[in-house]
């Protein structure tokens, strides 16, 4: 039997995936402005910048010239973090909520490594008695 937190977790996961699919469809199929901006970016630009360009135009031009893998990384890491957090809310054990978030995951891994080193040091100090 699912409790309230699990039900809300599944509702959150389904809404998150639905909104993601709708945004993906909007950006890549419907939005003509995005297509125009992509075409303007590809067209040849004059070598000498116009004197009337503002810092926002130059910033936009520099940001649009960044590689695709960088943009994908910047958007996908937070996207997957939110998704994995919502998915962890669907677990039956409330202590496991949030373990898949990167800072928490790194803290747990480091803590396990330190406890493993302590345990191995304690075992090496013990003397085995042969009977």
UniProtKB/Swiss-Prot annotation:
| Domain of life the protein comes from | Eukaryota
Q: Name the membrane topology term.
A: Multi-pass membrane protein
Name a single GO biological process.
regulation of vesicle-mediated transport
Q: Which UniProt keywords apply?
A: Golgi apparatus, Membrane, Transmembrane, Transmembrane helix
Transmembrane domains' residue ranges: 8-28, 66-86
What GO CC terms are in its UniProt record? Golgi apparatus; Golgi membrane
* InterPro entries from the UniProt entry: LYSET (IPR028024)
Q: Report the locations given in the UniProt record.
A: Golgi apparatus membrane
Q: Which is one Pfam family of this protein?
A: TMEM251
PANTHER family, alphabetized: LYSOSOMAL ENZYME TRAFFICKING FACTOR, TRANSMEMBRANE PROTEIN 251
Role summary? Required for mannose-6-phosphate-dependent trafficking of lysosomal enzymes. LYSET bridges GlcNAc-1-phosphate transferase (GNPTAB), to the membrane-bound transcription factor site-1 protease (MBTPS1), thus allowing proteolytic activation of the GNPTAB. GNPTAB is involved in the regulation of M6P-dependent Golgi-to-lysosome trafficking of lysosomal enzymes. LYSET is thus an essential factor for maturation and delivery of lysosomal hydrolases.
Family per similarity comment: Belongs to the LYSET family.
Protein name (Swiss-Prot/TrEMBL): Lysosomal enzyme trafficking factor
What species does this protein belong to? Xenopus laevis
């Amino acid at each position: 039997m699912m409790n309230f937190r699990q039900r809300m977790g599944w509702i959150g996961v389904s809404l998150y995936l639905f909104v993601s699919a709708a945004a993906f469809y909007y950006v890549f199929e419907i939005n003509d402005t995005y297509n125009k901006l992509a075409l303007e970016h590809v067209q040849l630009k004059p070598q000498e910048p116009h004197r009337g360009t503002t810092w926002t135009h130059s910033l936009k031009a520099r940001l649009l010239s960044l590689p695709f893998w960088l943009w994908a990384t910047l958007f996908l890491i937070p996207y997957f973090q939110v998704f994995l957090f919502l998915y962890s809310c669907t677990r039956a054990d409330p202590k496991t909520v949030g373990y898949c978030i990167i800072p928490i995951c790194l803290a747990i891994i480091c803590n396990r490594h330190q406890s493993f080193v302590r345990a191995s040091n304690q075992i090496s100090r013990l003397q085995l008695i042969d009977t």
